Amino acid sequence: MTRAVSVEHKTILVIRADGTETVVPMLRGTPPTEQAALLIRADMLDFVRIGLLEGTDLVMAVDDNGWEYEVVQHNEQHFEHRAIKARKPINQRATELYHEICKPGTTHQIVGDVAIMHDGDVP
C-alpha cells in the first residue's frame, strides 16, 4: 500500500507530475476549486474521493482535459469514454493514490499536477 497523504484543513497539497509536493494555504476570497485549478494549470477539474478508505473527506482535483478521449459506441445504449493519449506527463504518485481506491486491475493513470484538499473546506 502507498504512503497515505496528510493534508491540514484550509490547505491544498499540490503533487506535481515530477514528484514534488507543496502545501499551499487556501486564500480567503478565492474559492478553493478556483485556486486548485490555477495551481495545477487546469481549465476544467474532475474530483476523485481518495479519503474513503481512511474515513476522511480528502478529494484529489485532477485536470479533466489531461487526456485525449474517444467515444466508443458498443450498442445503442452503451457508450465508452476511452482515454487514448495523455496530454500531460503521468503523475506516478497521484496514480498510486487513485489506484488505492479503485477496483483491482484498474490501469488508468493520472496525468499532470493534482491538488488535494478536504471536501469540507470547499463551500
Predicted features along the sequence, with ranges:
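Short beta-rich binding modules
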Residues: M1-P123
